[in-house]
Amino acid sequence: MSSLFISLPWVAFIWLALLGAVGGARVQGPMRGSAALTCAITPRADIVSVTWQKRQLPGPVNVATYSHSYGVVVQTQYRHKANITCPGLWNSTLVIHNLAVDDEGCYLCIFNSFGGRQVSCTACLEVTSPPTGHVQVNSTEDADTVTCLATGRPPPNVTWAAPWNNASSTQEQFTDSDGLTVAWRTVRLPRGDNTTPSEGICLITWGNESISIPASIQGPLAHDLPAAQGTLAGVAITLVGLFGIFALHHCRRKQGGASPTSDDMDPLSTQ
């Protein structure tokens, strides 16, 4: 009998070792959207509760817990932010809403069994934002400077396709307060070179996706536009002034031609 009782802890240990939590997938969720993290335990065991934690320094933080006794309990800082959907003791799904950069990271799904024993798995979340882009052209007498800008998360890659791919260009980037990366590449095209093509294409790549944005350096110089507008305004003012002088002169001539004679003004005069 004593040998039986001695072997019971070893049996329990072997039983726990056979348990496994499945999940651990890497999930992507759109910024300001939602994402679902899922885990399950096989085979089914005597689980009393399931706890979701977020890994961070100096230690993990509880997000939400489910048990038959208390149902779903979400920690204060995650209320209106996260929830356990389809609650169960052998599988669990944590949904996070209104995703921001701070939500990115890895989460622990912990199955708690009798005796305080635990089986866990890890699911990691990546917050993404599909790229957007546009082209800016700045022209001077010496050169046309064309800049292609792209904003996204993870950082997008910006390149110039042929024929501008051989032109001198530089790429820079920075991350804004929302965690989005703004990347841009500038190409300088000297004027007076007849071999320089007037049209090019900016390529923005982001994972397996790509965006093509056409660019052109045709048209008037950017710095000439204000001067041209000023000239047109001056001509318009001059024309208005001349029209006013002409109208006033015409009105005076008309009044002078219709002036009454002295005889018309004295009805009592006799011959």
From Swiss-Prot:
Membrane topology: Single-pass type I membrane protein
InterPro entries per UniProt: Ig-like_dom, Ig-like_dom_sf, Ig-like_fold, Ig_sub, Ig_V-set, OX2G-like
Carbohydrate-modified residues: 83, 91, 138, 157, 166, 208
Keyword Cytoplasm: no
Extracellular side: 25-227
Subcellular location(s) of the protein: Host cell membrane
GO biological process, one term: heterotypic cell-cell adhesion
GO terms of molecular function: cell-cell adhesion mediator activity
Residue spans crossing the bilayer: 228-248
Keyword set, alphabetical order: Disulfide bond, Glycoprotein, Host cell membrane, Host membrane, Host-virus interaction, Immunoglobulin domain, Membrane, Signal, Transmembrane, Transmembrane helix
Pfam families in UniProt: V-set (PF07686)
Signal peptide annotation: 1-24
Cytoplasmic side, ranges: 249-271
Cysteine-cysteine disulfides: 39-109, 148-202
Positions of the Ig-like C2-type domain: 130-220
Boundaries of every Ig-like V-type domain copy: 26-129
Principal localisation: host cell
Processing after translation: N-glycosylated.
CC annotations in GO: host cell plasma membrane; membrane
Subunit structure comment from the entry: Interacts with human CD200R1.
Protein name: OX-2 membrane glycoprotein homolog
Organism field: Human herpesvirus 8 type P (isolate GK18) (HHV-8)
Gene it is expressed from: K14
